From Swiss-Prot:
One of its GO terms (biological process) is cellular detoxification of fluoride. Keywords: Cell inner membrane, Cell membrane, Ion channel, Ion transport, Membrane, Metal-binding, Sodium, Transmembrane, Transmembrane helix, Transport. Belongs to the fluoride channel Fluc/FEX (TC 1.A.43) family. Na(+) is not transported, but it plays an essential structural role and its presence is essential for fluoride channel function. Its main location: membrane. It catalyses: fluoride(in) = fluoride(out). This is Fluoride-specific ion channel FluC. It is a multi-pass membrane protein. InterPro entries: FluC. It comes from the Bacteria. The chain crosses the membrane at residues 5-25, 35-55, 67-87, 96-116. It comes from Burkholderia mallei (strain ATCC 23344).
Length: 128
C-alpha cells in the first residue's frame, strides 16, 4: 500500500507541474480559450490512450506503474474542474458561443486524441 501511495503522489506532482507550466506558457496567447488547460487535457487524453493499451498488453508490470502514470500523472495533468470553470465563466458572462466552443474543443479533442493514443500504442506494441 505504501508504494501505491507514493506512486500516485509522485505522479500527481509531476502531472500538476506540467499542467502549471503549460498554463503559464499558453494561457495568455488566447484568453478566450485558455490554451494551457486545453493542451493539458488533449495531451492527457493522448497519453492515457497510450497508457491504457500499454498496461493492458504488459500485464507483468508492477501495479504501481499504472498508478503512477494513470491515476497520478494523468490525474495531475488533466483538469475537469478548471475546464468547467472556464466554460461556465463564458456562460455567466453571456458569451455562449465561446462557452460552447471551449466545451467542444475539450470534449471532441480529448476523445479524438485518446483514440489516437490507443491506436498509436497498438501500432507500437503490435508483434513484429
Amino acid at each position: 500500500m505504501f508504494y501505491s501511495i507514493v506512486a500516485i503522489f509522485v505522479g500527481a506532482g509531476f502531472g500538476a507541474l506540467l499542467r502549471w507550466f503549460l498554463s503559464i506558457g499558453l494561457n495568455a496567447l488566447l484568453p478566450e480559450v485558455p490554451l494551457g488547460t486545453l493542451a493539458s487535457n488533449l495531451i492527457g487524453g493522448y497519453l492515457i490512450g497510450i497508457a491504457v493499451v500499454a498496461f493492458a498488453t504488459r500485464a507483468g508490470l508492477p501495479p504501481e506503474w499504472r498508478l503512477f502514470v494513470i491515476t497520478g500523472f494523468m490525474g495531475g495533468l488533466t483538469t475537469f474542474s478548471t475546464y468547467s470553470v472556464e466554460v461556465m465563466t463564458h456562460a455567466v458572462q453571456g458569451e455562449f458561443g465561446w462557452a460552447l466552443a471551449v466545451a467542444a474543443l475539450h470534449l471532441i479533442g480529448s476523445f479524438t486524441l485518446t483514440g489516437l493514443g490507443m491506436w498509436t500504442a497498438r501500432a507500437w506494441l503490435a508483434p513484429a
